[in-house]
Amino acid sequence: MESFSSKSLALQAEKKLLSKMAGRSVAHLFIDETSSEVLDELYRVSKEYTHSRPQAQRVIKDLIKVAVKVAVLHRNGSFGPSELALATRFRQKLRQGAMTALSFGEVDFTFEAAVLAGLLTECRDVLLELVEHHLTPKSHGRIRHVFDHFSDPGLLTALYGPDFTQHLGKICDGLRKLLDEGKL
């Protein structure tokens, strides 16, 4: 007997459609203004650090695609109880990473690239476990790309260095607002 599920088919079509349209207009459906400002600042940091506009665009586009797909999966109730526990763990790790990034930005001489890189790597691993059975290997590659890019100790050291002070300030302002509003 053939197993057919219109709900599964609709979810698959929605993910496919959204992956093709991962631009600014679709992102605003799932990503609020403050998050968008943080993403814009992360793009600028990536562009300045890599000296490559296409590479910076790719990493942010991958980040948006992943965020949108995970939001669609969550909104459609695709995660089971154990996966919801993983989603909670991911959110806690992401929140811990944001609070650590803020602390490093606000207190002079406390920055440690290894600590922040470790937290981002933990986030990556939990997210990969969460979406293991829901997203394609290509999406798993996007997750690795995004987290590996932003957990690069060289990029993190540059971000907390004197040349990126303005960017770091804007990122910290956005993270603080997201934490205060309970969105992170």
Swiss-Prot record:
Q: Which domain of life is it from?
A: Eukaryota
Q: Which UniProt keywords apply?
A: Cytoplasm, Immunity, Innate immunity, Lysosome, Nucleus, Phosphoprotein, Ubl conjugation
Q: Pfam families per the record?
A: DUF758
Post-translational modification as stated in the protein's UniProt record: Phosphorylated by TAK1/MAP3K7; this phosphorylation triggers association with BTRC and subsequent ubiquitination and degradation. Ubiquitinated in a BTRC-depdent manner; leading to degradation mediated through the proteasome pathway.
What does UniProt say about this protein's domains? The central region was initially thought to constitute a DED (death effector) domain. However, 3D-structure data reveal a previously uncharacterized fold that is different from the predicted fold of a DED (death effector) domain. It consists of a large, hydrophobic central cavity that is poised for cofactor binding.
The record ties this protein, via PANTHER family, to: TUMOR NECROSIS FACTOR ALPHA-INDUCED PROTEIN 8-LIKE PROTEIN 2, TUMOR NECROSIS FACTOR INDUCED PROTEIN
This protein is called what? Tumor necrosis factor alpha-induced protein 8-like protein 2
